[in-house]
C-alpha cells in the first residue's frame, strides 16, 4: 500500500535505510526493463512463458453491452466517399444531396483552432458514413454534430501537416463515431506534432485522433475480424483521446507513442471498454509526472482557465470483456485513474458541467453515484502488460509521481475471467478499493514492489481461478492488503515474496499454507505437497530466484487431512498442465527431502503457518502488524504509526527501505 506523507528528514535514518537497501531484491536490469537472458545474481525472476501450457477456459458474461455500440446496428442514411491523392481529393455523395455536405481546404488558424487540412461539414440530422481512401497530408476534420456517424478507413494513410494539428478530429458531442476498419485493409494515421511546438501548433487538441463524443474502433461486424489500423504519435499528448468513452471491438489496432515527449496511448474522460480484437500499445513518453500509460480513464476534466469541471457520475471505469491486449509502457499499463483526493468536484470555485455521455442513457441510467467510480472489471481476453519506468513519488498527491503498475483501479478491481500476464516495476495489480478474483489465470510479477495490492477495507478475496503472484523481496510481498482481510475461498494460488506479508484469513473456505524459505526449497527446485499416501496434491517449480515466503492454496488441499512438504523433488511433467510452473493437473513426482510433516488445517482455521515464518529483525519479518524492529512481528511502516520518538522515513522511501540510493 502506498501512502504519501510529509516526512521528517533525518540524516541518521537516511543512512540506516541506505545501508539496508541491499536487502531489497530487484527484478530488472539497469534500464528498468525485464531481462531477456538468464541472469539471477540480483534476484531477477525470469519467466518467458515456456513454463505454461495451461489454457484457461473460464468464461464470464460481458458487461456494458450496448446494442447501439455495434456497427452492424448502424444504418447509414447517406454516404460521403473521399479519395485522397497527396494534397488533393475527389469526393462522391450519395443518399443525401451533395449541397448538404461542405468539403473544403482550410489553413492554419489560431483564431478558430484549425490546422491545415480538409474540413468536412454536415449540419443535418441524418446518419452518414464517410469512406476515406488514399494518401493525404493534413488534418482531416469531420464536423457531424447531430447524429451518429461512421468513418470507414479503406487503405488510407493520413499524416498531419508540419506538426500543426491532430491527424483525425471529430467535433460531435453526445453522439458516437464508429471508426471502421474493414478486413483486408491496412491504414496508418501519423500525428507529427511535438511538445513545445507552439509556434506551429494551431490545433492543440489532446489526441492524434481526437473526439468530443464517443469513439468506437471496430471491424465491420462484431463477429468477424477487421483490418489493421496503425496510429503513431510523434510526441504530443495522447495518441487517442475522447471526452466521452472509447470502445474497441474486432480489428487490429496498433498504437505507438513514439517520441519521449508524448503521453498516453489511449485516454478517455468517461470510460474505456474493450470487447474483442487485437490491441498493441507502446508508450515511450518519459516526461516527469506524465510518463506514458497504455489505457487510462480520467473520470473528470477540470479546466483552470474558465474554472469548470466536467464529469459523468458513475463513470471513470475500464471494462475488458475480451480481446488480445499487449501493452508496453513507461508508466501504468491500464488505469482507472480518478482520485477523490485530487478532485475539484464540489469545489465552490468551479462550475460543474453535466457531461451528457451516452453512457448515462445506455449503461449508467440506474446509478446513484454522485461522483466518478473508477473501477476495473475484466471478464475475458488475453492481457499482457510490461512496465519499464522507475517508480518515484513526492510528499503529497499533488507532487510528481510515477507508479508503473500493470493494472490499477482507484476503486474496486474485479477479475472474472481472462489470461493475464503482468511484468511490472511497481505493483502488478493495485486497487484503491477491494480486489476480487473469481476466475481467470493471472501471473503478476513485480520487480520492485508488491504483486497484488489492495487498499480497500475488504482487502483481497480469491474465489477461483489460477493466481501466481511474485513480489519483490524485503518489505514487499505477493499479496498486500495491510490490516484488511486476505481471504482465499477457492482457486489455485501461489504467492512468493518478502516475509513482511499479509496473513491469509483463517475464515477462508479453502486450505492455505504459509511456508518460510527454509521449508520450500531453493531457486530452480521443485516443491511438492503430498498426502499420507505419498500422492502429490500440489506441485510448483520455483523460478531462478527465490523469495523469503510462500503462500499456497489449492482445491486439492482439504481440512482435517495430514500433509507433508517435500523439497528438491524430481518432476516428470508428462501430460500435466501448468501455469508459470504452478501445476494445475498433477505430474509424476519422486525423491526430494521432507521439510515438514503432519501439517493440517481445520474447518475453523483454514490456514497453516510454518514455524519458520515470522522470524527476523529490522523492517519486516512476519505477518503484517503495527510497526517495530522486533523479531517475529512485521516492522511494516506503511499506513501505520511509527514507534514513539522514531522519525518517519525520509521522503521518497514510501515508508520502507529503498531499493537503491537515487
Predicted regions and their residues:
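Bacterial N-terminal signal peptides that target proteins for export
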Residues: 2-12
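A composition-driven surface/loop motif
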Residues: 9, 27-662
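Hydrophobic helical h-region of N-terminal Sec-dependent signal peptides
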Residues: 12-21
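C-terminal motif of bacterial Sec signal peptides marking the signal peptidase cleavage site
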Residues: 22-26
Amino acid at each position: 500500500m502506498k501512502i504519501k506523507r510529509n516526512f521528517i528528514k533525518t540524516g541518521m535514518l537516511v543512512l540506516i535505510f541506505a545501508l539496508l537497501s541491499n536487502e531489497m531484491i530487484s527484478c530488472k536490469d539497469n534500464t528498468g526493463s525485464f531481462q531477456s537472458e538468464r541472469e539471477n545474481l540480483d534476484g531477477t525472476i525470469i519467466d518467458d512463458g515456456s513454463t505454461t501450457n495451461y489454457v484457461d477456459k473460464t468464461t464470464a458474461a460481458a458487461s456494458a453491452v450496448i446494442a447501439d455500440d455495434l456497427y452492424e446496428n448502424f444504418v447509414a442514411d447517406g454516404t460521403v466517399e473521399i479519395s485522397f491523392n497527396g494534397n488533393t481529393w475527389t469526393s462522391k455523395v450519395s443518399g443525401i444531396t451533395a449541397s448538404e455536405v461542405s468539403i473544403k481546404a482550410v489553413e492554419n488558424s489560431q483564431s478558430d483552432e484549425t490546422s491545415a487540412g480538409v474540413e468536412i461539414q454536415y449540419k443535418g440530422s441524418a446518419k452518414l458514413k464517410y469512406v476515406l481512401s488514399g494518401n493525404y497530408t493534413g488534418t482531416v476534420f469531420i464536423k457531424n454534430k447531430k447524429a451518429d456517424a461512421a468513418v470507414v478507413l479503406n487503405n488510407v494513410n493520413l499524416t498531419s501537416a508540419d506538426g500543426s494539428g491532430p491527424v483525425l478530429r471529430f467535433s460531435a458531442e453526445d453522439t458516437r463515431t464508429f471508426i471502421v476498419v474493414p478486413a483486408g485493409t491496412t491504414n496508418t494515421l501519423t500525428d507529427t506534432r511535438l511538445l513545445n511546438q507552439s509556434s506551429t501548433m494551431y490545433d492543440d487538441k489532446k489526441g492524434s485522433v481526437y473526439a468530443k463524443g464517443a469513439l468506437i474502433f471496430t471491424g465491420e461486424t462484431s463477429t468477424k475480424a477487421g483490418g489493421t489500423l496503425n496510429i503513431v504519435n510523434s510526441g504530443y499528448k495522447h495518441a487517442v483521446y475522447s471526452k466521452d468513452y472509447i470502445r474497441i471491438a474486432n480489428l487490429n489496432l496498433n498504437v505507438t507513442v513514439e517520441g519521449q515527449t508524448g503521453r498516453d496511448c489511449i485516454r478517455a474522460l468517461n470510460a474505456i471498454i474493450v470487447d474483442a480484437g487485437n490491441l498493441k500499445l507502446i508508450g515511450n513518453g518519459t516526461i516527469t509526472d506524465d510518463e506514458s500509460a497504455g489505457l487510462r480513464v480520467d473520470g473528470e476534466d477540470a479546466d483552470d482557465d474558465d474554472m469548470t469541471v466536467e464529469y459523468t457520475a458513475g463513470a471513470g471505469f475500464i471494462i475488458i470483456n475480451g480481446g488480445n491486449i499487449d501493452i508496453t509502457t513507461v508508466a501504468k499499463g491500464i488505469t482507472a485513474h480518478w482520485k477523490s483526493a485530487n478532485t475539484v468536484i464540489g469545489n465552490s470555485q468551479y462550475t460543474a458541467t453535466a457531461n451528457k455521455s451516452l453512457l448515462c442513457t445506455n449503461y449508467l441510467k440506474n446509478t446513484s453515484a454522485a461522483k466518478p467510480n473508477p473501477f476495473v472489471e475484466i471478464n475475458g481476453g488475453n492481457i499482457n502488460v510490461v512496465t519499464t519506468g522507475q517508480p518515484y513519488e513526492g510528499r503529497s498527491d499533488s507532487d510528481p509521481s510515477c507508479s508503473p503498475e500493470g493494472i490499477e483501479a482507484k476503486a474496486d478491481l474485479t477479475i472474472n475471467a481472462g489470461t493475464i500476464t503482468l511484468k511490472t516495476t511497481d505493483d502488478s495489480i493495485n486497487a484503491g478499493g477491494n480486489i476480487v478474483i473469481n476466475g481467470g489465470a493471472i501471473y503478476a510479477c513485480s520487480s520492485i514492489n508488491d504483486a497484488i495490492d489492495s487498499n480497500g477495507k475488504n482487502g483481497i478475496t480469491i474465489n477461483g481461478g489460477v493466481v501466481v503472484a511474485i513480489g519483490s523481496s524485503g518489505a514487499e510481498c505477493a499479496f498486500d492488503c495491510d490490516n484488511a482481510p486476505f481471504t482465499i475461498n477457492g482457486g489455485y494460488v501461489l504467492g512468493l515474496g518478502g516475509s513482511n506479508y499479509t496473513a491469509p484469513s483463517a475464515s477462508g473456505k479453502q486450505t492455505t499454507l504459509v511456508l518460510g524459505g527454509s521449508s520450500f526449497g531453493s531457486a530452480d527446485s521443485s516443491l511438492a505437497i503430498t498426502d499420507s499416501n505419498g500422492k502429490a496434491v500440489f506441485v510448483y517449480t520455483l523460478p531462478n530466484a527465490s523469495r523469503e515466503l510462500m503462500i499456497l492454496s489449492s482445491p486439492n488441499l482439504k481440512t482435517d487431512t495430514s500433509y507433508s512438504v517435500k523439497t528438491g523433488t524430481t518432476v516428470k511433467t508428462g501430460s500435466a498442465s501448468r501455469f508459470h510452473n504452478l501445476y494445475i493437473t498433477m505430474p509424476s513426482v519422486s525423491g526430494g527431502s521432507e521439510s515438514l510433516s503432519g501439517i493440517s488445517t481445520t474447518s475453523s482455521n483454514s490456514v497453516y503457518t510454518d514455524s519458520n515464518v515470522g522470524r527476523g529483525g529490522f523492517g519486516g519479518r512476519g505477518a503484517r502488524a503495527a510497526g517495530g524492529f522486533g523479531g517475529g512481528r512485521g516492522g511494516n511502516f506503511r499506513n501505520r504509526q511509527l514507534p514513539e520518538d522514531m522519525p518517519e522515513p525520509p521522503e521518497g522511501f514510501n515508508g520502507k527501505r529503498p531499493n537503491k540510493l537515487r
